[in-house]
Amino acid sequence: MLEPWARQTLAAACQHGETILLSMDQTDLGNRFAILMISLGVGHRALPLAWAVEAGPANLGFTTQQALLERVRAWLPAGAEVLLCADRFYPSVDLFQWLAAQPGWHYRLRLKGNLNVDPGFGEITTTGALAQGHSERYLSNVWLFNEGVPTNLAIWHEPGHPEPWIIAMNDPPHRATVQDYACRWGIEPMFSDFKSRGFQLEDTQLQAADRLDRLLLIMTLAMYW
């Protein structure tokens, strides 16, 4: 049911050659449900495009991520350029490989600090060790995970923040490209629209994931309207 609105909104987002900004993130309703959502950045906010609901506390894995990403990919205008931002719970070998196979897709994936990385000099280390003591650092052609997934790394530690951004990307790493990751913050006020500052989704008495899925559709249509 959402497809016509999603297609129209995605087409409008790139009608003058702009890059389409997608974010992937998860929100939970206590321990009752986990909701993984892909949204479109619109100004300082976001619009939902596709989501999956699972009962119980969970980090929804690549199988679910891929299904949502491929649904959104099918709605994109031909030749559209895409930037996908995702938080540090989601990067995996499978996700990197999927993104590498998508023409016109760029990514900014935040990484945990405990991932193995071969920086191309010295010994294999961790992403956190590479970030230690640096406010900015940019590394091209590194190899992530034990499987050796090729990517670029940008590290940005803003004063006053407890943790740095460690961002994997398939574009040249520098200050401007690492700051692209801030585009994902539009998904946070969107989740607030669903929850405490809007529809009060956290107060739902629904017990079944499929019914919550339909409720999200109704709320999303209201956002598009």
Positions of predicted regions on the chain:
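Active-site-proximal cofactor/substrate-binding loop regions of enzyme domains
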Residues: L10
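An active-site-proximal beta-strand-loop segment
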Residues: S23-I35
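Single, function-defining residue in the core of a domain
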Residues: L2-A6, C14-I20, N31, V42-W225
